[in-house]
């Protein structure tokens, strides 16, 4: 597909939301860097002294310049990733994707079940503003929800669980938040890139998002449509006993804080994460 045919949904627009962490980054490991774009995280996987790296997710609408700046600050002027891997296709994870494709001309990979939402075929279910929670949940119907059109720039991840250009990682299907949601895990050091399978900030609360108050909890409530699958995905990740985790929202967590928090979430998922009411709660 020609670049000029790439397009966002008609409802795509800048979201004036931010957090205390916006614009900052954390070197979680020598080859794992977490950068916050307003209220969402991207990851850069690769050592700065090597120059080869992969970008995980693509931030908020209008954030391309911020992401390119973060990349060049870490890897040098003119650097570009070998590929972009998407944990899923919600607007806050693909918001700068088309600009980045045009800037870098690199392939994009996602789970096959996520491709309809990335090729203009299917829109996600409407956010549930009725869920219990804070202001962000209430305004979620105003978030972009029309599908992005990436055409042949996006490819399905290999069925064998390998991750292009990241041979030490494996991708895991962690549905619930979206049908084709994935997380990335590296067995030798138990490093986890969770996406939104679980997060470390209560994403429906504006105050907690603004302050980035750490709390290991389930996926963002207003966008999660399959709570049974979400529960099983958290249990799958907890069973890996990750040593460090970067999630789609909130600060990276590690060690005892991660182990205890994720174990508790897996054990008490319905009490901690699932809603008492909402149109996707059954």
Where are these regions (language model features)?
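Metallo-beta-lactamase
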Residues: 3-16, 60-62, 114-175, 179-257, 269
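Conserved beta-strand hairpin/beta-sheet module of binuclear metal-dependent hydrolase folds
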Residues: 18-75, 183-195, 200
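Short, structured coil segments at secondary-structure junctions
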Residues: 28, 103-104, 241
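Residue-level marker for buried hydrophobic side chains located in beta-strands
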Residues: 54-56, 85, 108, 191-193, ...
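Active-site HxH/HxHxD metal-binding segment of metal-dependent hydrolases
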Residues: 64, 72-155, 264-265, 271-272
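Short, charged, surface-exposed secondary-structure boundary motifs
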Residues: 117-121, 202-204, 279-280
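Binuclear metal-ion centers of metallo-dependent hydrolases, dominated by the metallo-beta-lactamase
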Residues: 250-282
């Amino acid at each position: 597909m020609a670049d000029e045919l790439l397009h966002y949904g008609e409802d795509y627009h800048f979201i004036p939301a931010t957090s205390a962490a916006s614009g900052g980054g954390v070197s979680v490991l020598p080859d794992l860097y977490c950068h916050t774009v307003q209220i969402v995280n991207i990851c850069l996987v690769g050592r700065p002294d090597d120059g080869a790296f992969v970008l995980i997710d693509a931030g908020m609408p209008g954030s391309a310049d911020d992401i390119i700046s973060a990349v060049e600050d870490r890897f040098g002027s003119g650097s570009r990733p070998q590929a972009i891997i998407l944990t899923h296709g919600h607007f806050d994870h693909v918001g700068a994707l088309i600009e980045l494709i045009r800037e870098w001309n690199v392939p994009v990979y996602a789970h096959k079940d996520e491709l309809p939402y990335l090729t203009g075929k299917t829109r996600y279910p409407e956010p549930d503003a009725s869920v219990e929670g804070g202001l962000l949940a209430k305004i979620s119907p105003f978030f972009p929800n029309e599908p992005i059109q990436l055409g042949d720039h996006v490819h399905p991840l290999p069925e064998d669980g390998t991750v292009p250009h990241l041979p030490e990682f494996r991708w895991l299907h962690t549905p619930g938040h979206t049908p084709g949601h994935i997380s990335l895990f590296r067995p030798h050091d138990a490093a986890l890139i969770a996406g939104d399978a679980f997060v470390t900030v209560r994403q429906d609360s504006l105050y907690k998002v603004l302050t980035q108050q750490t709390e290991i909890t389930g996926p963002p409530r207003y966008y999660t449509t399959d709570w049974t699958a979400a529960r099983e995905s958290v249990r799958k990740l907890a069973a890996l006993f990750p040593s460090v985790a970067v999630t789609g929202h909130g600060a990276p967590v590690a060690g005892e804080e991660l182990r205890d928090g994720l174990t508790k979430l897996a054990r008490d998922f319905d009490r901690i994460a699932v809603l008492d009411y909402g149109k996707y709660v059954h």
